[in-house]
Amino acid sequence: MAAEVYFGDLELFEPFDHPEESIPEPVHTRFKDDDEEDENGVGDAELRERLRQCEETIEQLRAENQELKRKLNILTRPSGILVNDTKLDGPILQILFMNNAISKQYHQEIEEFVSNLVKRFEEQQKNDVEKTSFNLLPQPSSIVLEEDHKVEEACAIKNNKEAFSVVGSVLYFTNFCLDKLGQPLLNENPQLSEGWEIPKYHQVFSHIVSLEGQEIQVKAKRPKPHCFNCGSEEHQMKDCPMPRNAARISEKRKEYMDACGEANNQNFQQRYHAEEVEERFGRFKPGVISEELQDALGVTDKSLPPFIYRMRQLGYPPGWLKEAELENSGLALYDGKDGTDGETEVGEIQQNKSVTYDLSKLVNYPGFNISTPRGIPDEWRIFGSIPMQACQQKDVFANYLTSNFQAPGVKSGNKRSSSHSSPGSPKKQKKESNSAGSPADMELDSDMEVPHGSQSSESFQFQPPLPPDTPPLPRGTPPPIFTPPLPKGTPPLTPSDSPQTRTASGAVDEDALTLEELEEQQRRIWAALEQAESLNSDSDAPVDTPLTGNSVASSPCPNELDLPIPEGKTSEKQTLDEPEVPEIFTDKSEAGHASSPDCEVTSLCQKKAELAPVNTEGALLDNGSVVPNCDISNGGSQKLVPADTSPSMATKIHSPIPDMSKFATGITPFEFENMAESTGMYLRIRSLLKNSPRNQQKNKKASE
């Protein structure tokens, strides 16, 4: 019954299955006469022989197909069985008779027994339908019967599988075996039947077989971690139940580390260096197409690569442009000097984020930014691109990068250089004073006590231009030496550290003044400073303003002025200050009080007293009044800042550091109004502090 149903594989043979009477006769074959030959010398006899051989081959193939169809009918299983409910209905059972003595002997009896069961069930179903209907679901399983009855029943476990599973249907022949599905497909769904049981083969070879004359280096396997105490791989050494053997543990640990080093000898303590990477990829160069790359792209050396035409539309590669970019540290250095030109507001920070490029790193791409070599056609129309652009040429692109991305140190040409600025400009005055005062400050002793107010006033002092008219000098002061500004085209003055200037200044100082006269001039300077301090106390400005000279004028002692300063540094400062208007006190009402000129201060520095140079400049207070400002910066030079009451001139000079008065904006003073309970707390706990362990140890040491 089941053998008549086939899977459908017979349809493969339908194109070759023709009845004998339906075989068409060849109508296109025409033979010539026997005496006629073909142009190639082939006669009809040979053609007939070939045709006969072909017909014999066809007959053999048809006979072979018939044999295969017969075998296919034998090997195939029933298919096309449709089951309404797969949980309640299905094939009765599946029996596979293997090559066994029992199956050969009881083959017929087993088939008859199954047929009798089916007939008896059909008869019961006709007589009583209710008895044959079971409420319980069938138990789909396949049981493997063991032939060995000596095994105890307690140990025997039934190997139950799901319904319709493949137990195995392998047909073994002499030279091959055929593994055919032994279970019919249920509802044409192969998922209801399990797949094949893939056999597991034992590994015969454990080593790689190499070719003749070649040696294969097999990487040693990393040893498995084990207990160094007992050698077991099931637990670690900390969980070992055996007593510890220190000698064995150290020996096994050493063997394990040596084995790990041999297994990972290539990657053990290996470092990567940039030179190795460069050597590895050094043969690849941008813009250069090797023969291997040409073969990979399918182009020759007589044509441009396709990506060149695409680059004309997209532009220069951004990745290689990034390689040509010069890196900037991004650090900004503020030295306190005014480098602005009045274009930025006070307190504004100028961030220089300019990007520069190294033009030598620009890549040459023939056909894109340089001309195409001779003999290579420009096929931009075929690739749907554009012709070479003049703006993409290498020299044009380099000029664009140079003009639009300048170096950080290059300034624009619209700013005036310092040589063309007027000698009396405030900016030049500040630069000259800083350049003259800084060498003297650098050579002072670092352990000297410097007033705090002088440091703050030096770092935050404001330097307006000189006043229009000058007040008279104090009594007993020799007239200053006026040096008019040099006209344009005149060579500069002789440097102050030149031998001629140093010799002349030294001769005047040594012959003109004695030690008593120098001490008298020093007393006059101190008297002028004390009177300036009294003027500051009468003004409305706060006493602790960093721009005033109160803390400076009252703090230094004569010992602080006895500082060794080189003669060249002092004369240099004097020479730089001479082209300007003489520095004087700007308080017109106090005409009789001022400091001595620079020549006297220079002579003080060159004697044994070694006094510091004094620049008689005035300090500008917040209320507009001018007082002398004795600024001993780093314990060195004394500087009096010139004053100007014009606010318009003061606002034009900018500093990268805000004014000191702006640091206290929005800060309210703490008046200690609600601190009545907190006062006197130290007096209350002083007795406890005396009994502290630290004080007790000190008392013990003192008593010992």
From Swiss-Prot:
InterPro entries: NEXT_complex_subunit_ZCCHC8, PSP_pro-rich, Znf_CCHC. Residues 454-463 have a biased composition (Low complexity). A zinc finger (CCHC-type) spans 225-242. Residues 43-78, 514-538 form a coiled coil. Residues 16-43, 407-516, 529-599 are annotated as: Disordered. It is found in: Nucleus, Nucleoplasm. Keywords: Acetylation, Coiled coil, Isopeptide bond, Metal-binding, mRNA processing, mRNA splicing, Nucleus, Phosphoprotein, Spliceosome, Ubl conjugation, Zinc, Zinc-finger. The modification N-acetylalanine is found at residue 2. The keyword Plastid does not apply. Residues 16-33 have a biased composition (Basic and acidic residues). There is a cross-link at residue 411 (Glycyl lysine isopeptide (Lys-Gly) (interchain with G-Cter in SUMO2)). Phosphorylation at Thr-490 by GSK3 is triggered in cells entering mitosis. One of its GO terms (molecular function) is RNA binding. GO terms for cellular component: catalytic step 2 spliceosome; nucleoplasm. It holds the Pfam family PSP. The modification Phosphoserine is found at residues 596, 646, 655, 692. Residues 656-704 are annotated as: MTREX binding. Component of a nuclear TRAMP-like complex, an ATP-dependent exosome regulatory complex consisting of a helicase (MTREX), an oligadenylate polymerase (TENT4B or TENT4A), and a substrate specific RNA-binding factor (ZCCHC7 or ZCCHC8). Several TRAMP-like complexes exist with specific compositions and are associated with nuclear, or nucleolar RNA exosomes. Identified in the spliceosome C complex. Component of the nuclear exosome targeting (NEXT) complex composed of MTREX, ZCCHC8, and RBM7 that directs a subset of non-coding short-lived RNAs for exosomal degradation. This is Zinc finger CCHC domain-containing protein 8. It comes from Pongo abelii (Sumatran orangutan). The lineage of its organism: Eukaryota, Metazoa, Chordata, Craniata, Vertebrata.
